[in-house]
Regions:
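General small-molecule cofactor/ligand-binding pocket signal
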Residues: 11, 64-68, 252, 283, ...
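Conserved PLP-enzyme active-site core in the AAT-like
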Residues: 20-32, 36-182, 244, 261-262, ...
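Conserved phosphate/anionic-ligand binding catalytic regions in large, soluble enzymes, centered on
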Residues: 144-157, 161-162, 206-210, 298, ...
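Non-catalytic terminal extensions of PLP-dependent enzymes
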Residues: 4-5, 178, 193-204, 211-429, ...
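Short acidic-aromatic active-site loops that bind/stabilize oxyanions
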Residues: 1, 15, 87, 91, ...
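Short loop-beta-helix segment that forms the pyridoxal 5′-phosphate
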Residues: 4-23, 420-445
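Short glycine-centered, acidic/aromatic-flanked micro-motifs in structured strand/loop junctions
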Residues: 12, 42-44, 86-88, 294-296, ...
Length: 828
């Protein structure tokens, strides 16, 4: 979808919002641009939220942000640039040919970043055709409600040559061991979980679920439907513009797609008041100009209401044929898009339903079995919690409507903030960060602003344990901090002596310690209070990664045992669905002395946060509509229920730890022999003895109907298991028995009962095509391959593909839909 509409070579699997996508594009440009420039140009006609977020992002690196008129600046500027960011169409709806600006940016050695509207690209020439290096934007209008700010998927597309510098997840095509096409995460060595502070971004959670919705929207409508929607939207804008001009108004531009900006002059305030009285929100640019945007959901009666508001008496009785001369002829698109059969096949609700069901059947999701991903907290997302997100009161509002119209939302925000403060023991909360990694970044930027306010800008060293999430060092780097790694001891705790030595060594420059509690090793850090005291004694602040908060809620409050700020993964502890990689929300909670430095936003004109770090998300409250899920969870559970959930999550993890310790080595426990809410199983002794790896075990679990646990993190050669409180004893026993049975299979390899080069472990997962083939080439039986436990005969999950060739996928990177010819070859 994104590759076709932008014309670029490669696209990632989504980003958080348009503003952060633009900031990530600036980051890519900085990585790949060969000159020594410190200058970044952003056109003043970009959206204000985008300009402000880019300003926040580049500030720690001493780069110069120039916001101005793109024509004048690019013509007069003689020095080199890192990049130039331009909008197409721009924030006022104007469509100007950006090719000259793109050419000027590239002549100055910079990369040309074009922020574009995905629907308009059904009508307009692609950014690629105009010479852009990077295209970004928001896919919200492809089937996703506004949601008072989100969630919706941003997109990021660029040239093939920049693929190894791209931010975010990339889904690529590979093959399984039979040569069948398979999808996988590609080029992961760019990402934070591997490259840490050298990663291309700190992205972990993005907006995968919303990207799927937008892709499904395009599949359902197809190229003809998308073009019809684009034409209808533009037609309404043109009808309005024509009548306005006849009535004597002057337009800001006659070239537009869906946004008409009118020079209202001395009538501005009167028109704006009339609009509010009619429950219509218009964008008042200043005292002279009002901007009107049409979307795909508007109708002719909306146009007539607008004409009435603008004092135009004539009514349009029917949608007459209108020539869409509002798009310059030279910018009209001629290239084809969405030509793949998947976009041209499923255009009835029946067929679309069956196609989506077919895709669902390929997944191991929580509606099928327990997902034991360590450090992910894959708990139940209860239906009652999620119903309100479908209500129009939550789903329809625009993020920049007047705040006095959103009293219900404000009550919800304040209520949630109050609850999160009570749960964490902190004094203030910002709901703006729209992922856990963004929460980390926001928290560290808040600490940075605190030090700067104390005239200690030199404090830029961030101590991070070697067990930390990869997002920690990546976020520290984004905040302009230098990462210094602290060792852990043999029990999984922070090495206190190493921490003392490094805190003392860097005491003059120490900004922060990032610590996860309970630790990523699955144990409660026994000396957490002393650890915090060491940092404070040496002038630093303590950032607590709240990834494992599910083991603390109702039991202990981070704000009371030492940390100064933490983020809260609402998509983990507080029940927002993970969505296969988003949406998420990562609010931050902090102590009183950091409150005034929390993120601000240009929409909040009366904010008390005068020293705030600027915006970290496009919308003031991030992905606001999904906050209702966490609100519902907290209210339904109550304080006793929240505490019980934490207790059961710890109990379940310890039950699994004890049960699996019969045949596996549990790597870390506390001094009492217990774990926190997750446990790490050491596979290294097994590999040393039999050659079987953690990946083999993860693949074999698929044959048993289970999603893989977290592999090789935080310790290489291990698997990490987190059951959450949502699983009952029957399901936990079933999962444990699957792993114990797998250990028996491994023992059979060791004893010679299974061949080392042909056994159920190294050939897993087994597909129904292999099981149903006329010829069975293995030394073990079909029964041993596919039905190692009796329950599988009643309800069996079949992997859609066999073992995937990871090396092939990275060496032969393909990130667009494979042609249908290849599928035909497979079936032949």
């Amino acid at each position: 979808l994104v590759i076709d509409l932008t014309g670029m070579d490669i696209a990632n699997a989504s980003l958080l919002d348009e503003a952060t996508a633009a900031a990530e594009a600036v980051g890519l440009a900085q990585r790949v641009t060969k000159n020594n420039s410190k200058k970044i140009f952003v056109s003043e006609t970009c959206n204000p939220q985008t300009i402000n977020l880019i300003k926040t992002r580049i500030e720690p690196f001493g780069l110069e942000l120039i916001v101005g008129n793109q024509k004048d600046f690019l013509k007069s500027e003689k020095s080199e640039l890192i990049c130039g960011v331009i909008a197409y169409p721009d924030t006022l709806g104007d469509i100007a040919d950006p090719s000259e600006a793109i050419s000027q940016i590239r002549k100055k050695g910079g990369k040309a970043i074009v922020i574009c509207d995905l629907l308009s690209l059904a009508k307009l020439k692609t950014p690629a055709e105009l010479g852009a290096d990077i295209a970004v934007g928001n896919a919200q209008r492809f089937g996703v409600p506004m949601g008072y700010g989100g969630p919706h998927a941003a997109f990021f597309a660029t040239k093939e040559e920049f693929k190894r510098s791209m931010p975010g997840r990339i889904i690529g095509v590979s093959v399984d061991r039979f040569g069948k096409k398979a999808y996988r995460l590609s080029l992961q060595t760019r990402e934070q979980h591997i490259r840490r502070d050298k990663a291309t971004s700190n992205i972990c959670t993005a907006q995968a679920l919303l990207a799927i919705v937008s892709a499904a929207y395009a599949i359902y409508h197809g190229p003809k439907g998308i073009l019809n929607i684009a034409n209808r939207t533009s037609k309404l804008a043109k009808l309005f513009a024509d009548k306005i001009k006849i009535a004597g108004y002057e337009l800001h531009s006659d070239n537009f797609f869906d946004t008409v900006t009118v020079k209202t002059k001395d009538k501005t305030d009167e028109i704006y008041r009339k609009a509010i009285a009619e429950k219509v929100n218009l964008r008042k640019i200043n005292n002279q100009i009002i901007s009107v945007a049409f979307d795909e959901a508007k109708r002719l009666d909306h146009v007539n209401l607008l004409l009435k508001i603008f004092g135009v008496k004539e009514v349009i009785n029917k949608s007459t044929d209108v020539k869409l001369e509002n798009i310059p002829q030279e910018l009209l698109r001629s290239s084809k898009y969405l030509t793949h059969p998947v976009f041209n096949k499923y255009h009835s609700e029946t067929e679309m339903m069956r196609y989506l069901k077919k895709l669902e059947d390929s997944d191991i999701a929580l509606n099928r079995s327990m997902i034991a991903l360590g450090s992910c907290t894959m708990k139940l997302n209860a239906t009652a919690e999620m119903i309100p997100i479908s209500w129009k009161e939550f789903s329809l509002p625009h993020p920049f409507v007047p705040i006095n119209q959103m009293k219900g939302y404000q009550i919800l925000f304040n209520d949630l903030i109050k609850d999160l403060k009570e749960i964490t023991g902190f004094d203030a909360v910002s709901l703006q960060p729209n992922s856990g990694a963004q929460g980390e970044y926001a928290g560290l930027m808040t600490i940075r602003a605190f030090h700067k306010n104390n005239n200690e800008s030199n404090r830029d060293v961030c101590l991070i344990p070697n067990s930390a999430h990869g997002t920690n060092p990546a976020s520290a780097q984004m905040s302009g901090m230098k990462v210094v790694v602290v060792n852990c001891d043999e029990n999984g705790n922070i090495d206190l002596e190493d921490l003392k030595n490094k805190s003392k060594k860097y005491s003059k420059d120490l900004a922060a310690l990032m610590v996860t509690y309970p630790s990523t090793h699955g144990v409660f850090e026994e000396k957490i209070i002393e650890i915090c005291n060491i940092i404070h004694t040496n002038g630093g602040q303590v950032y607590m990664d709240g990834a494992n908060l599910n083991a603390l809620v109702g039991i202990a409050k981070p704000g009371k045992f030492g940390p100064d700020v933490c983020h809260i993964n609402l998509h983990k502890t507080f029940c927002i669905p993970h969505g296969g990689g988003g949406p998420g929300m990562g609010p931050i909670a902090c102590a009183k002395h950091l409150e005034e430095f929390l993120p601000t936003h240009h929409h909040l004109q009366n904010s008390k946060l005068t020293k705030g770090v600027g915006s970290v998300s496009a919308a003031p409250w991030g992905s606001a509509s999904i906050l209702v899920i966490s609100w519902m969870y907290i209210k339904m559970m109550g304080s006793k229920g929240l505490k019980l959930a934490s207790q059961i999550s710890i109990l379940n993890a310890n039950y699994i730890s004890k049960k699996l310790s019969e045949k596996y080595k549990v790597l870390y426990t506390g001094k009492n022999g217990n774990v926190a809410h997750e446990c790490i199983i050491d596979i290294r002794p097994i590999k040393e003895k039999t050659g079987i790896t953690e990946e083999d075990i993860a693949k074999r679990l698929i044959d048993y109907g289970y999603h893989a646990p977290t592999m090789s993190w935080p310790v290489s050669g291990t698997i990490m298991i987190e059951p959450t409180e949502s699983e009952n004893l029957e399901e936990i026993n079933k999962f444990c028995n699957a792993l114990l049975n797998i250990k028996d299979e491994i023992d059979k390899i060791d004893s010679g009962s299974f061949e080392k080069k042909d056994n159920p472990m190294i050939n897993a997962p087994h597909t129904y095509l292999e099981l149903s083939s006329d010829e069975w080439k293995h030394s073990y039986s079909r029964q041993e391959a596919a039905f190692p436990k009796k329950y599988l005969k009643d309800h069996k999950y079949w992997a859609p593909v066999a073992r995937v060739d990871n090396v092939y996928g990275d060496r032969n990177l393909v990130c667009s839909c494979p042609s249908m010819d290849e599928y035909k070859d497979e079936a032949a």
